[in-house]
């Protein structure tokens, strides 16, 4: 008999800073998941980085037992998801393990772009979406306006949305009651052959690969032999359990539950995310539909400062890819920086987070080159190639057509900041698609070049709208554009790691700005250092870092002018010889100067 009516699986989805993690804390407290001593703010954000930045990066799962007012005890498996646009992949994976989702909306700020995007993902996957108005204790909370926005912008009924304040704990028990009533119980047979979906996995130095799974059918317990469908390998289960949020072992995991499986898998790619697990004696079980592979949007080169760290760096990347399956990498070598990897990220925040995690968790020193998006080139020979690294661009004479990626951006902004946002979009070469007035907010849709969006668009959008505008974007198409490669020459030598692909209209401005920025960052040498920006063979900007020179005339008090001339000529000849053989050290900041051209 498989009675799953007491299980509820749900995710919490919301825009950044609308209080998902705080609400999760309240659930844990009310259901007694942790003692008062162990409780801390944002208990699920376990990474230091998450706490410092105040954002959720990884989705976290928790199993709690809630005694409802009808006298039954329900098992709640919930997943706290990230709200930032760079981590939408984490959200879609979490939703695949659930039957319902709580849409948390800040009652002061109202609906924002990311809530809309995540909510549509949930509805597409057939989940029951239950709106919750959070932050009701704030003086600026306006529940009626926000309910109206939820109905107008997202299109789900919000008349009886539950109002609560996760910070003060007001109304949280009501959220749990409503959740138990409105979110459906999972379906599945405990007696059927095991079928489990891997939602997430990470590497533990002692336990091997730990996989977070959602069991669809059957059950799994310690001592079972499991088969990983994609690799065909069989592993012995060491332990199964759930997070309460502590690591808690249980006797077994049954259909409808979410928990972890440890089976001493030592190979990092032994249990990929989105794979199906079954028992070794029922290998004919169907593979569950996994997750679509996500395409990175931004590429950047990562190089270890010391070449001795290359092997450690590769191991670290492998372990990180297991935990973050949207990260892609391949080996790359650069004349200026030696050996490293070209990594693909979902956006700039993702790139920063990965670099910081590598430096902290694996103790590496890294240099990052300027990020670039993927361009499509049609060559004179008729073939089409994609390029993600400016230094790998073929010669201009061989290229027939240059195409850049265009994204469709949806921006939600209060009416008073609309003018600034439109000005910013025009500056970034945007084309307006449509505009809708929804209550006090405006929803504008723009087609924007992706390389303008990924660099600093998000920060500029926030500052121009005083933090009120919100953004969601997705790749739409490739479109022809007048693009050129901007090379940076230092003392006449091209530095491959500093090359950029820019629009021809902005090239002269970008070239000047970049050389000026580099002049500030490259330390003065004993000889003049020329910094030039060039398109092909044409130099479009130049600055010089002046030489440090010793005053060789200090010892000549009076005396003949020819004596002074002789000393100056001697110094000049020495500097000239030095310049021919001298190397210039380029500091890490210079490689990232490209990012901060506009600021």
From Swiss-Prot:
What role does this protein play? Required for accurate and efficient protein synthesis under certain stress conditions. May act as a fidelity factor of the translation reaction, by catalyzing a one-codon backward translocation of tRNAs on improperly translocated ribosomes. Back-translocation proceeds from a post-translocation (POST) complex to a pre-translocation (PRE) complex, thus giving elongation factor G a second chance to translocate the tRNAs correctly. Binds to ribosomes in a GTP-dependent manner.
Q: Where does GTP bind?
A: 17-22, 134-137
Q: What is its EC number?
A: 3.6.5.n1
GO BP term (any one)? positive regulation of translation
Question: Which PANTHER family does the protein's record reference?
Answer: TRANSLATION FACTOR GUF1 HOMOLOG, CHLOROPLASTIC (PTHR43512:SF4), TRANSLATION FACTOR GUF1-RELATED (PTHR43512)
Q: Name one GO cellular component term.
A: plasma membrane
Q: What is the name listed in the Swiss-Prot or TrEMBL entry for this protein? A: Elongation factor 4
Q: Which reaction does it catalyse?
A: GTP + H2O = GDP + phosphate + H(+)
Keyword list (alphabetical) reads: Cell inner membrane, Cell membrane, GTP-binding, Hydrolase, Membrane, Nucleotide-binding, Protein biosynthesis
Gene this protein is translated from: lepA
Belongs to which family?
Answer: Belongs to the TRAFAC class translation factor GTPase superfamily. Classic translation factor GTPase family. LepA subfamily.
The record's section on Pfam families has: EFG_C, GTP_EFTU, GTP_EFTU_D2, LepA_C
| Membrane disposition | Peripheral membrane protein
InterPro entries, A to Z: EF-4, EFG_III/V, EFG_V-like, EFTu-like_2, LepA_C_sf, LepA_CTD, LepA_IV, P-loop_NTPase
> Can you give the residue ranges of the tr-type G domain?
5-187
Locations listed in the record: Cell inner membrane
HAMAP family, per database record? LepA
From the broadest rank down, the organism's phylogenetic lineage runs: Bacteria, Pseudomonadati, Pseudomonadota, Gammaproteobacteria, Pseudomonadales
> One GO molecular function term?
GTPase activity
């Amino acid at each position: 008999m498989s009675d799953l009516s007491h299980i509820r699986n749900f995710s919490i989805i919301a825009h950044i800073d609308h209080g998902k993690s705080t609400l999760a804390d309240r659930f844990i407290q009310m259901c007694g998941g942790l003692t008062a001593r162990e409780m801390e703010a944002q208990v699920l954000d376990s990474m230091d980085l998450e706490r410092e930045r105040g954002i959720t990066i990884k989705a976290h799962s928790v199993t709690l037992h809630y005694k409802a007012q009808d006298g039954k005890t329900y098992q709640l498996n919930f997943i706290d998801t990230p709200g930032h646009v760079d981590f939408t992949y984490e959200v879609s994976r979490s939703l695949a393990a659930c039957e319902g989702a709580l849409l948390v909306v800040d009652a002061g700020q109202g609906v924002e772009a990311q809530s809309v995007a995540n909510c549509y993902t949930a509805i597409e996957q057939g989940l029951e979406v239950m709106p919750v108005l959070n932050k009701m204790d704030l003086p600026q909370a306006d529940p009626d306006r926000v309910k109206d926005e939820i109905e107008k912008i997202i299109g789900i009924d919000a008349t009886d949305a539950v109002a609560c304040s996760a910070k003060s704990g007001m109304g949280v028990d009501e959220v749990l009651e409503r959740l138990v009533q409105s979110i459906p119980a999972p379906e599945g047979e405990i007696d059927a052959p095991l079928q489990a979906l891997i939602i997430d996995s990470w590497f533990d130095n002692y336990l091997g690969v730990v996989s977070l799974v959602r069991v669809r059918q059957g059950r799994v317990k310690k001592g079972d032999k499991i088969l990983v469908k994609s690799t065909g390998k069989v592993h012995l289960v060491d332990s199964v359990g759930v997070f309460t949020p502590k690591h808690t072992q249980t006797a077994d995991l049954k259909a409808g539950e979410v928990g972890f499986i440890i089976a001493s898998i030592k190979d990092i790619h032994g249990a990929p995310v989105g794979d199906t697990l079954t028992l070794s004696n029922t290998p004919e079980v169907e593979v569950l539909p996994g997750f679509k592979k996500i395409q990175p949007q931004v590429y950047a080169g990562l190089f270890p400062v010391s070449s001795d760290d290359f092997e450690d760096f590769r191991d670290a990347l492998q372990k990180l890819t297991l935990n973050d399956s949207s990260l892609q990498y391949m080996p790359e070598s650069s004349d200026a920086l030696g050996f490293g990897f070209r990594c693909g990220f979902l956006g700039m925040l993702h790139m920063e987070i990965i670099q910081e995690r590598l430096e902290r968790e694996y103790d590496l020193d890294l240099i990052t080159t300027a990020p670039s998006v993927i361009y499509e080139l049609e060559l004179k020979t008729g073939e089409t190639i994609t390029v993600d690294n400016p230094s790998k661009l073929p010669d201009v004479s061989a290229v027939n057509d240059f195409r850049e990626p265009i994204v469709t951006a949806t921006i939600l902004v209060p009416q008073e900041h609309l003018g600034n946002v439109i000005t910013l979009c025009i500056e970034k070469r945007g084309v307006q698609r449509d505009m809708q007035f929804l209550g006090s907010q405006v929803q504008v849709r723009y087609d924007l070049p992706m390389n303008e969006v990924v660099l600093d668009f998000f920060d500029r959008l926030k500052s121009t709208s005083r933090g009120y505008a919100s953004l969601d974007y997705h790749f739409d198409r490739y479109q022809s554009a007048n693009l050129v490669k901007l090379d940076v020459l230092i003392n006449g030598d091209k530095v491959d790691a500093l090359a950029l692909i820019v629009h021809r209209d902005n090239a002269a401005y970008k070239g000047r700005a970049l050389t000026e920025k580099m002049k500030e960052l490259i330390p003065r040498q004993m000889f003049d250092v020329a910094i030039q920006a060039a398109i092909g063979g044409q130099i479009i900007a130049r600055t010089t870092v002046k030489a440090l020179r010793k005053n060789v005339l200090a010892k000549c008090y009076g005396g003949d002018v020819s004596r002074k001339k002789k000393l100056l000529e001697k110094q000049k000849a020495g500097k000239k010889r030095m310049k021919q053989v001298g190397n210039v050290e380029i500091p890490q900041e210079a490689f990232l100067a490209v990012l901060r051209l506009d600021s």
